[in-house]
Every structure is written in structure tokens, then in C-alpha cells.
């Protein structure tokens, strides 16, 4: 679960002022509440239970690649995919362990295989958008118009174990950067090719 927070709310927290409770259907202010009390409750719960996460909506909207379609109002439940109203969440993961190759010197990441998998995954996720039967026409229309996908990885810690790289090392951080740079670069290239 993630809670959407605005810069105006955070300003009210820092100044210990109330913030407006706005009806999202009408845009009318229906009350006020202490921003600091709400923020303290959110932070306490996150510390005690791990929930909720916090999403900074103003920041997300500054990076909105399709502002003509509307403002980002929420994310999927875990917060990794910002969504416009009526967009659907289309996520996929690549298992990095399946992209290791044993050599006489030890295990190595097969970058060519990973690149091919990234390209295939982008096509697969785009095909999911195409063949999915959405429960509402608005979801169908919005999802097909923005064609938003999210491609991530799993098995990173296991991959590091095979490679003999400590998870908490500078080399581990560098490997994470290299892998995700490849996923992002190739993923964007393939998305542009599809467009």
C-alpha cells in the first residue's frame, strides 16, 4: 500500500499546519486535519509494519511522459508503476540466474542472452496489452493509448552469489547499475522500435 503525498502536504507538515481534505469527485474542500499528526501516523506505521509506502505525486507528475492524458493520481499497490486514471499495471521480471554462463574461469553474466531476453520481454508485455480483455472500456482505451509496461529483474542476490560478489560491496552496487542500465537502455530501444 502506498500513500500519495503532495509538496503542499509536506509544507504543512514542516510548518505544523492543517491541510485540506478534498473530495476527489468534486474537488471541494470538505474539512481539514493536522498534517503533522497524519504524517506521524504514516511514519509510525511504516516503521512498525513496513506499510504504507509514500509516493510523492508532484514529483511523479513532473516526470509524467504523457501529461496530455492526465495527471498521475496513484501507483500500483507496491508503488513501482505510476498510473494515470484507468491505466492497468503490466509488469514482468527477468530471472538473472537464467542468464549466467559457466566458463572455465567461473560463472559470468551472458549479456547477449540477457539483451535478447529484454527485447523478447518488451514484446511479450506489449502483446499482453494487446490481447488482454479489460473489465472496463475506460481501462481498455487508456491502457492501449499509453501502452505502459514495467520490466524488472529477480534473482539478483542469487546471481551475485554465483559470481562471487558480496551483496553489500561496491562491486555489487556496480553490477546492479550495469544490469539495470542494460535493462533500461535495451528496453527503451525495443519500445521505440515497436512504436
What residue spans do the PLM features occupy?
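Internal maturation/activation junctions in enzymes
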Residues: 1, 117-140, 165-195
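Active-site cavity-forming subdomains of large catalytic enzyme subunits
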Residues: 1-111, 134, 138, 187-195
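Eukaryote-specific, cytoplasm-facing alpha-helical/coiled-coil scaffolding segments in long proteins
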Residues: 66-70, 148, 182
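A general alpha-helix detector
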Residues: 41, 155-159, 175, 190
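N-terminal glycine-/lysine-enriched basic segments
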Residues: 134-153, 160-161
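Short, hydrophobic/amphipathic alpha-helical patches that form generic packing surfaces
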Residues: 44, 93, 124-127, 158-159
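Short helix-capping/linker segments at secondary-structure and domain boundaries
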Residues: 97-104, 160-168
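Catalytic-loop motifs flanking and including active-site residues across diverse enzymes
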Residues: 87-90, 149-155
Amino acid at each position: 500500500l502506498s500513500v500519495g503525498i503532495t509538496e503542499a502536504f509536506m509544507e504543512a507538515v514542516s510548518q505544523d499546519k492543517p491541510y485540506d481534505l478534498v473530495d476527489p469527485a468534486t474537488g471541494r474542500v470538505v474539512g481539514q486535519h493536522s498534517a503533522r499528526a497524519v504524517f506521524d501516523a504514516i511514519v509510525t506505521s511504516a516503521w512498525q509494519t513496513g506499510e504504507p509506502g509514500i509516493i510523492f505525486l508532484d514529483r511523479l507528475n513532473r516526470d509524467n511522459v504523457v501529461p496530455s492524458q492526465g495527471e498521475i493520481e496513484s501507483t500500483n499497490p507496491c508503488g513501482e508503476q505510476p498510473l494515470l486514471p484507468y491505466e492497468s499495471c503490466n509488469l514482468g521480471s527477468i530471472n538473472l540466474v537464467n542468464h549466467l554462463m559457466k566458463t572455465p574461469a567461473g560463472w559470468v553474466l551472458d549479456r547477449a542472452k540477457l539483451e535478447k531476453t529484454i527485447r523478447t520481454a518488451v514484446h511479450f508485455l506489449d502483446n499482453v496489452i494487446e490481447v488482454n480483455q479489460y473489465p472496463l472500456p475506460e481501462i481498455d482505451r487508456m491502457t492501449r493509448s499509453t501502452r505502459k509496461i514495467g520490466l524488472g529483474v529477480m534473482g539478483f542476490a542469487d546471481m551475485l552469489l554465483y559470481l562471487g560478489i558480496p551483496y553489500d560491496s561496491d562491486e555489487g552496487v556496480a553490477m546492479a547499475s550495469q544490469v539495470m542500465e542494460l535493462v533500461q537502455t535495451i528496453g527503451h530501444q525495443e519500445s521505440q522500435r515497436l512504436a
